């Protein structure tokens, strides 16, 4: 299940969509298919009304014949509980030798028949939202390789999307880049990683050092950021990430039009200047040469024309590439990274 301390999920995948009918409930599966279509062999739906990703519908038997290794629960529901209606399919998959990966709050191992099959060596269960493997504390020692970390003015401002877009664009430019996941969906996309918000606080920076250790076999690690130094709920996670990432380059993410810190109407958003200054100061504890290389915006609240003008205005103001990754791509940010 692990390589050292890092979860390693076998590929390719069969994406399990269960019986969900809300497209938003399948956003994890959709993200996997968007960013790693080559590892998604098909989908399995329990009812005709279940949302579809447009993948081939397969039975467990068909997927196994095609070479699928892991059944991935690509959905979410209120409370994160695995419904009883799903359990027969999960049990059949485990009995057939599929590994099973889930980002749900409820652990797969809480379903006793699945836990028994894992203990007997017939399956492997990956609860990517949880992490129980011992870790070392961070040490801040210089590591081989170059690293990008996405940071933000708040949580849920596009740090994972931006990191994946940067990885994709760097690869297109013949740069050997690897996405390093620190959250549940990112782990399922990458097939490996550590869910940082499941790590005991003392070990957060050490976990990031484990996710992105010394490397010389590729050019850049693109590390998925979490939270924000300015979000009172999650700033501790963000600080540990900054220290452990030892990033050479930071990419700042922000949502245009957000009125306040998410779910905290009493907490004001920081200015862009404050966010840049605080993140660089924290990053430079473990990499004194850390620098900002771009700003990625979620401009969905305004028109595309206004967004293009805003990106140009901000680029002039901050003297860095500024873009909306969804609307305009991240070529300019990638080009700046390649100058380091």
Language-model regions, residue ranges each:
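Extreme N-terminal, non-catalytic leader segments
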Residues: 79-80, 89-147
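Walker A (P-loop) phosphate-binding motif
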Residues: 133-177
